[in-house]
Amino acid sequence: MAVYNYDVVVLGSGPAGEGAAMNAAKAGRKVAMVDDRRQVGGNCTHLGTIPSKALRHSVRQIMQFNTNPMFRAIGEPRWFSFPDVLKSAEKVIAKQVASRTGYYARNRVDVFVGTGSFADEQTVEVVCPNGVVEKLNAKHIIIATGSRPYRPADIDFHHPRVYDSDTILSLSHTPRKLIVYGAGVIGCEYASIFSGLGVLVELVDNRGQLLSFLDSEISQALSYHFSNNNITVRHNEEYERVEGLDNGVILHLKSGKKIKADALLWCNGRTGNTDKLGLENIGIKVNSRGQIEVDEAYRTTVPNIYGAGDVIGWPSLASAAHDQGRSAAGSIVDNGSWRFVNDVPTGIYTIPEISSIGKNEQELTQAKVPYEVGKAFFKSMARAQIAGEPQGMLKILFHRETLEILGVHCFGYQASEIVHIGQAIMNQPGEQNNLKYFVNTTFNYPTMAEAYRVAAYDGLNRLF
């Protein structure tokens, strides 16, 4: 058994692991990374964020081709199969792996391929693919092993027509009708993708409103758009059982309803990847979803062991995971890079996309904050008209008296990009966070960014 000594060992090479390893390495620490894949990037690169967003981009291009009058004049709408569209995503994955492999090489981070588990509080044993065991001793260890789809024991995920958000990327045909169980972020994104390919989608939601954490107006806009695009949303429903057929599936609901489709995509929750870490050897406990509890420094109950990313739960975003990993390493190297990541923009890549930051109307009303609203509808924006993307709006919530921006919510074309302008102003200290910034700033024309000026004027006109 080979033995190696490090300052920091990072378990997992997804966004959290990458952020942690890079920060520690740049602070002069000797760093090792352990991942069970031969290629770095974690689930984000191989099964989650990157392939699904690349897939979405390709589907959106197909939708534009099939609905744009100029292209329709050339010929009839084209049909593309799911496997064909997926090929473009595979190219992006390869490029991402190459980039990230280069990061670790340039920063002299040693990458170990294998399954890592704790022998004790300062030792990780790595079982390599060839069966060889290597021992890594470290002063500090960061757990960033991510998560995987939650799989109820009573559902047969080995059935060829039953998928989760990982295995859906191996779908070898294009279903005519698809059931998506779970209307969270992942479920809504895949419902949009398959709808864009002309698939009839049944989206089953166990709550009364889509993405209820969003501003209610944005949630309602998404529901309306879904209803116009071959997506039937069934609220307040729970599954009783899943019946697999030779040519499809039947979803039995507790309400007594039955839904038949060519395939089922299960998108109801995630489970932390902690079951193979040997946490029982060091006294770290996990919750019912396999997640680790950490403090504001991302430290677990064992002082030299930290956690970051999906493995610690909320908010389970790639963007937040990277910052959490970087902050966990910052707690170790004490280079001023630590911060508790609690206010990050939400990006939801439905078609159209959604993004938000800060408070929504429900929260401000409940807190009895005197706020006002400013809106800019994309159908009136020159850039949106040029792009043929009239759906959507930008919504700014601000304090009636101080004009402090309290929340930014966007639905439509480039929403995940637009939100960062509002985020930047909201993070300014004191009176610099002010709605009038958007009135007094010159925006390029035509751009989607100038929606901020339109929304600011709209909001100021509501004051009296």
From Swiss-Prot:
Cofactor: FAD
Manner of cofactor binding, per the entry note: Binds 1 FAD per subunit.
A Pfam family of this chain: Pyr_redox_2
UniProt catalytic activity: NAD(+) + NADPH = NADH + NADP(+)
Keyword presence, NADP: yes
One GO CC annotation: cytosol
Keyword terms, alphabetized: Cytoplasm, FAD, Flavoprotein, NAD, NADP, Oxidoreductase
SUPFAM superfamilies noted in UniProt: FAD/NAD(P)-binding domain (SSF51905), FAD/NAD-linked reductases, dimerisation (C-terminal) domain (SSF55424)
Compartments reported by the entry: Cytoplasm
Any one GO MF annotation of this record: dihydrolipoyl dehydrogenase (NADH) activity
Residues reported in the UniProt entry to bind FAD: 35-44
Single GO BP term: 2-oxoglutarate metabolic process
Enzyme Commission number(s) of this protein: 1.6.1.1
InterPro entries: Class-I_Pyr_Nuc-Dis_Oxidored, FAD/NAD-bd_sf, FAD/NAD-binding_dom, FAD/NAD-linked_Rdtase_dimer_sf, Pyr_nuc-diS_OxRdtase, Pyr_nucl-diS_OxRdtase_dimer, STH_gammaproteobact
Function text: Conversion of NADPH, generated by peripheral catabolic pathways, to NADH, which can enter the respiratory chain for energy generation.
Family: Belongs to the class-I pyridine nucleotide-disulfide oxidoreductase family.
Protein name: Soluble pyridine nucleotide transhydrogenase
Lineage: Bacteria, Pseudomonadati, Pseudomonadota, Gammaproteobacteria, Pseudomonadales
Gene responsible for this protein: sthA
